[in-house]
């Protein structure tokens, strides 16, 4: 954990606790000393803030390349260990960087939908999370984040002081699929299983 991440995590956790009284369930499901993927629904650009504040482990996100486009952004996201990804282009370098981080026993966050959806509506999951999980041979913890759309909807600048909730599901193991990260059928099946578990935590059905 870098000094910058540690400082931002401390300040962010205090801010989130003060403003949002976040309820966290199942934190113990995030394994402590091994590589693990957190796969979450995505309702708001505020999700990473809530998720980081809910978790004691340093988290590494796949962040869109636009966030690295200026000096401050590149310094901030690089210094805190975030992984640059060019959305919509199957960024192989970014996925390999995620695999490398997992093999170093780090925790990597995926938002499989690839963009935000209003409320707790679930979009179709992309297979990048499955490809990485199967190549790195690590468990996936499904995560459900509630109410962040109401806290900071798309296009809004300032968060509302509303309560948030984060639920960490039990880790998913895909032993029978490991080593099949380039198998399209396998990655589609694993992606479906991951999304179904996220949907279950949200109390919804995955319809894709």
Enumerate the language-model features and the residues they cover.
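Short, well-ordered coil/turn elements that cap or connect secondary structure elements
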Residues: 16-19, 56, 135, 161
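Catalytic core of membrane glycerolipid acyltransferases/transacylases, capturing the structured
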Residues: 9, 17, 30-90, 97
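Short gly/ser/thr-rich secondary-structure transition/capping motifs
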Residues: 17-25, 89, 148-150
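A short beta-turn/loop motif at secondary-structure boundaries
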Residues: 28-31, 159
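Non-catalytic C-terminal accessory region of glycerolipid acyltransferases
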Residues: 3-4, 93-208
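Short, flexible active-site-adjacent loop segments at beta-strand->alpha-helix junctions, enriched
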Residues: 28, 42-43, 50, 55, ...
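N-terminal membrane-anchoring alpha-helices
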Residues: 1-23
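Generic structural signal for residues in well-ordered beta-strands
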Residues: 22-24, 82, 140, 166
């Amino acid at each position: 954990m870098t000094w910058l991440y540690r400082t931002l995590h401390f300040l962010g956790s205090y801010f989130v606790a003060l403003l949002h009284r976040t309820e966290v369930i199942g934190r113990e499901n995030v394994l402590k000393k091994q590589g693990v993927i957190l796969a979450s629904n995505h309702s708001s650009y505020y999700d990473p803030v809530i998720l980081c504040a809910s978790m004691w482990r340093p988290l590494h996100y796949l962040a869109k390349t636009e966030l690295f486009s200026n000096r401050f952004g590149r310094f901030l996201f690089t210094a805190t260990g975030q992984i640059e990804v060019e959305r919509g282009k199957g960024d192989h370098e970014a996925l390999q960087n995620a695999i490398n981080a997992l093999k170093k026993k780090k925790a990597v966050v995926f938002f499989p939908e690839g963009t935000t959806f209003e409320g707790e509506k679930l979009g179709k999951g992309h297979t990048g999370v499955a490809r990485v999980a199967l190549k790195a041979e690590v468990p996936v913890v499904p995560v459900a984040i509630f109410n962040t759309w109401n806290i900071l909807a798309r296009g809004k600048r300032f968060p509302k002081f509303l309560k948030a909730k984060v639920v960490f599901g039990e880790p998913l193991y895909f032993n029978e699929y490991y080593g099949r990260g380039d198998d399209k059928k396998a990655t589609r099946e694993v992606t479906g299983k991951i999304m179904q578990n996220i949907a279950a935590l949200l109390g919804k059905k995955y319809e894709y």
